[in-house]
């Protein structure tokens, strides 16, 4: 965001680890399947024939959610073993009580390529229609709620509402489109659509964030300097929402710290999904180690992987009771929200390697706000491990 240009921002990382196709028919903007929209990522549907149980996946355990009744239909986003995944963590088991159907290949291909065109000012109902039910919700720096949407971390969105309308939107969905701009477009393509009257964040070159002050909202386009300077993510923020927090940094609270930790964890897994590697499990034990280091750096005014006692990340993990074969750590400070922190980490090769490494299976994130001249500055720590 605009105010980031005057911040002091730091990043450090440490680790210990080993076709072109064409469509025969033009696709409509909304793909209908028997009168109902076929969502991007949807692979089929289940029709309920007899009462049957729907489960919710809670940390790998299937818990009772509700009983689906005859006549109800549910979208299916994945078919694994004998279970159909309905989105939102909901699961239904294959049985004679349900009928599974799939659309034509043409409809599936069109649904995959259909752009998502949500933008600032769209209604809450349009969000639900396009994205379904949120997976999680967190507090943001403006004091409002951010809802997180994804399908097993694909098509990732984080959306905040103000007066029941979209006030901020972050996405890594390659099908998303705003003002004719999509994820993976180049800087020159961006300039051809919106012009060259923009601000940049980061060093003079390479450019890491391009910010346009549009009539109703601020549009931030994150640039991946390690992928031919293509757009990696988009963040739109309504000026009305920005004005709810005129200060350089948000008012700190334990709730906001926990929210930043949750969002940063979600961003890492969304990134891993984009990069084609398996997502990480959240570990509260590892997160406690990360949290302690962020707090220690903030309270004692230093920024380093080794703390003032000379303990390395690996020492701290061991002291925290974490057993590991591989481990890595990313730290950052000064970024007013997790979006900018994550995208900056991805533009640093050492941090990027930790985030997308197949050597890790678990992640713990810790955030802390420390007193500073302009308010409270956030410190972030990500600890990656493989037991």
Can you annotate each of these PLM segments?
Residues 60-83, 113-126, 130-139, 180-187, ...:
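Extracytoplasmic Gram-positive cell-surface binding/anchoring modules and repeats
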Residues 92-95, 105-107, 139-179, 209-252, ...:
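Amphipathic N-proximal alpha-helical interface segments
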Residues 111-117, 174-181, 249-259, 273-283, ...:
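Second-shell loop/turn segments in exported
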Residues 24-106:
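Beta-loop motif signature
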Residues 1-24:
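Sec-dependent N-terminal signal peptides of Gram-positive bacterial secreted proteins and lipoproteins
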Residues 256-315, 361-363:
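Short, well-ordered surface patches within globular domains
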Residues 161-163, 168-219, 313-387:
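A well-ordered secondary-structure block
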Residues 108-114, 119-162, 188-229, 358, ...:
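A cross-family detector of function-defining hotspots
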């Amino acid at each position: 965001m605009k105010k980031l240009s005057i911040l002091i921002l730091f990043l450090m990382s440490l680790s210990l680890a080993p076709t072109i196709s064409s469509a025969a028919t033009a696709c409509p903007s909304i793909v209908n399947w028997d009168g109902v929209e076929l969502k991007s990522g949807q692979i089929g549907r289940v029709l309920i024939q007899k009462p049957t149980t729907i489960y919710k996946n809670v940390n790998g355990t299937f818990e009772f959610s509700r009983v689906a009744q005859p006549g109800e239909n549910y979208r299916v986003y994945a078919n694994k073993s004998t279970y159909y995944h309905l989105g939102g963590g909901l699961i239904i088991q294959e049985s004679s009580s349900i009928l599974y159907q799939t659309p034509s290949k043409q409809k599936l291909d069109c649904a995959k390529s259909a752009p998502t065109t949500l933008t600032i000012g769209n209604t809450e109902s349009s969000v639900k229609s396009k994205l379904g039910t949120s997976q999680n919700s967190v507090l943001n720096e403006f004091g409002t709620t951010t809802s997180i949407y994804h399908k097993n971390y694909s098509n990732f969105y984080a959306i905040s509402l103000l007066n029941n309308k979209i006030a901020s939107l972050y996405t890594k969905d390659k099908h998303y489109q705003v003002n004719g701009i999509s994820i993976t477009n180049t800087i020159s393509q961006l300039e051809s659509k919106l012009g060259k009257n923009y601000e940049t964040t980061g060093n003079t070159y390479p450019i890491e964030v391009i910010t346009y002050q549009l009539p109703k909202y601020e549009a931030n386009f994150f640039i991946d300097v390690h992928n031919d300077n293509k757009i990696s993510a988009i963040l739109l923020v309504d000026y009305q929402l920005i004005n709810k927090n005129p200060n350089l940094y948000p008012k700190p609270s334990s709730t906001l710290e926990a929210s930043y930790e949750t969002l940063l964890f979600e961003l890492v897994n969304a990134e891993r999904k984009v990069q084609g590697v398996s997502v990480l499990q959240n570990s509260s034990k590892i997160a406690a180690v990360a949290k302690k280091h962020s707090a220690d750096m903030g309270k004692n005014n230093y920024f380093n992987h080794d703390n003032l006692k000379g303990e390395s990340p690996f020492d701290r993990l061991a002291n925290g009771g974490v057993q590991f074969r591989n481990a890595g750590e990313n730290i950052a400070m000064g970024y007013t929200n997790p979006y900018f922190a994550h995208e900056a980490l991805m533009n640093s090769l050492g941090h990027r390697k930790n985030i997308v490494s197949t050597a890790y299976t678990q992640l713990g994130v810790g955030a802390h706000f420390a007193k500073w001249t302009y308010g409270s500055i956030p410190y972030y720590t990500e600890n990656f491990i493989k037991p």
